[in-house]
């Protein structure tokens, strides 16, 4: 047995800045200029979208290059006419640029201990390790707010500790067969963009007043994970395996919305929302902020297979295959109400229920080629979506894709090699939709079609 201990310290710093016009006001149209000079006709919208009959497929769109030249905006200066100040300002710009200014410092301290063993039990080789890690996370974040022409630096801090035990055991019950078990408590810190106390606040007289603020007090994503796999190494460089896994996500991060009066916003964070004459205490705002929510369980299995076909005759012995299939079921609780006291259960965002990859390859040392296929099932990207549904809970997601790639290379000499690679040979498009959990509505809101890509190359070693 071997006993190990250690310590670690890491410090990260992230800074952001931005520059923008002080106002979005535009000057009067220059003399001798018409609307036609500043616009163009956008045509051909809706291809491959199956739009209903009568849908608009063309409209007038602004010509940004023409507008910049006509108004002199490309000078990035103050032209001296009303609305013609095109200077890009930073912190002194209290209306449109402050949201881009932020700095975050994260300090991570850790201590760990681990016991490794490699022994036998009932004649079977057994190896593994058991250990635990203590980690402390200290976060300091700062952003800016501007009210009544006064720019205020808004700061926040958070500090949390985690104890993360882990256990890994590998048993070889018979030759070339491995049974592996793993259990661990894991954590993943929230992204920097969720922590910054940067304020976004609509105008006091806006029809629908909104406010948003980062949340430096977020806890990390936390989960308990369990994995069990059976692996059979049935031939040289060959593997057939089956694995099951379970993850209990106990802490999740979701952006929530709730109705709050300005007085409640001030009480919550007086630095970000100071009392102001043009902000009546009773005015109601829709307040958005990242929030910790309960999470939920995730279960699934994975099948993997790889084998070179060395048992085949002649050139066929240079063939081989690699393939895997994963199925996942998850039940994540997403907050759906203003007070965050009601939830809807749906799949984990950005995770496909089914996915598989397969590669057929040939390699004789001088010539190699491979064809790969990758399938990904439909998955959610946001639950609930920003725009509410009329029949159910609105969600956004991405439709299923099947992509096929191929490549080949040939060593002409020891120094010269030629290659060709084809990407997205099935001409798959990126289609994202806005739908509802009941499946009634399916509206495309993103359709990107990049087409097939082919690359030809040559490499020479001197």
Say what each PLM segment does.
Residues 1-3, 18, 120-127, 174-176, ...:
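Short loop/turn motifs that connect adjacent beta-strands in outer-membrane beta-barrel proteins
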Residues 104, 187-249, 271-309, 349-354, ...:
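Outer-membrane beta-barrel signature, preferentially recognizing the C-terminal barrel domain
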Residues 250, 375-387, 409-462:
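C-terminal beta-signal and adjacent terminal beta-strands/loops
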Residues 1-6, 108-172, 223, 322:
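Surface-exposed extracellular loop regions of Gram-negative outer-membrane beta-barrel proteins
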Residues 7-15, 119, 132-140, 183-189, ...:
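Transmembrane beta-strands of outer-membrane beta-barrel pores
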Residues 246-248, 266-385, 426:
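Gram-negative outer-membrane beta-barrel transporters
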Residues 19-100, 259-291:
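Flexible glycine-rich, low-complexity coil/linker segments exposed to the extracellular/periplasmic environment
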Residues 96-102, 147-156, 211-216, 286-292, ...:
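Extracellular loop and loop/strand-boundary signature of outer-membrane beta-barrel proteins
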């Amino acid at each position: 047995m071997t006993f190990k201990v250690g310590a670690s310290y890491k410090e990260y710093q992230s800074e952001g800045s931005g520059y923008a016009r002080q106002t979005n006001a535009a000057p009067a149209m220059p003399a001798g200029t018409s609307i036609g000079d500043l616009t163009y006709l956008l045509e051909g919208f809706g291809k491959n979208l199956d739009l209903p009959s009568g849908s608009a497929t063309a409209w007038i769109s602004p010509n940004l290059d023409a507008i910049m030249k006509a108004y002199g905006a490309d000078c990035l200066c103050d032209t001296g006419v009303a609305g013609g100040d095109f200077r890009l300002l930073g912190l002194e710009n209290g209306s449109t640029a402050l949201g881009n200014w932020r700095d975050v410092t994260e300090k991570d301290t850790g201590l760990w201990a681990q016991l490794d063993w490699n022994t036998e039990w009932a004649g079977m080789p057994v190896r593994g390790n058991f250990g635990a890690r203590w980690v402390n996370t200290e976060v300091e974040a700062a952003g800016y707010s501007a009210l009544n022409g006064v720019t205020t630096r808004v700061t926040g801090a958070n500090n949390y500790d985690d104890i993360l035990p882990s256990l890994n055991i590998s048993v070889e019950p018979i030759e070339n067969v491995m049974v592996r078990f793993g259990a661990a408590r894991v954590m993943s810190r929230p992204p920097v963009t969720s922590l910054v106390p940067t304020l976004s606040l609509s105008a006091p007289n806006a029809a629908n007043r909104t406010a948003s603020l980062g949340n430096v007090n977020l806890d990390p994503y936390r989960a308990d994970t369990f994995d069990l796999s059976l692996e059979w190494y049935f031939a040289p460089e060959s593997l057939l395996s089956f694995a099951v896994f379970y993850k209990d996500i106990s802490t999740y991060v979701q952006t929530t919305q709730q109705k709050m009066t300005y007085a409640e916003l001030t009480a919550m964070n007086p630095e970000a929302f100071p009392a102001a004459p043009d902000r009546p205490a009773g005015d109601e705002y829709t307040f958005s902020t990242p929030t910790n929510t309960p999470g939920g369980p995730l279960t699934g299995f994975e099948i993997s297979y790889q084998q070179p076909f060395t048992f085949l005759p002649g050139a066929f012995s240079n063939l081989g295959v690699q393939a895997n299939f994963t199925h996942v079921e998850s039940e994540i609780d997403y907050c759906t109400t203003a007070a965050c006291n009601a939830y809807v259960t749906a799949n984990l965002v950005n995770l496909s229920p089914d996915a598989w990859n397969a590669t057929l390859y040939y390699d004789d040392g001088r010539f190699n080629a491979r064809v790969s296929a990758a399938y990904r099932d439909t998955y959610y990207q946001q639950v609930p979506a920003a725009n509410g549904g009329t029949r159910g809970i609105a969600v956004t997601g991405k439709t299923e894709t099947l992509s096929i790639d191929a490549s080949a290379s040939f060593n002409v000499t020891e120094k010269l090699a030629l290659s060709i690679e084809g990407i997205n040979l099935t001409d798959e498009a990126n289609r994202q939709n806005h739908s509802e959990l009941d499946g009634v509505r399916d509206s495309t809101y993103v359709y990107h079609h990049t087409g097939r890509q082919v690359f030809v190359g040559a490499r020479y070693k001197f």
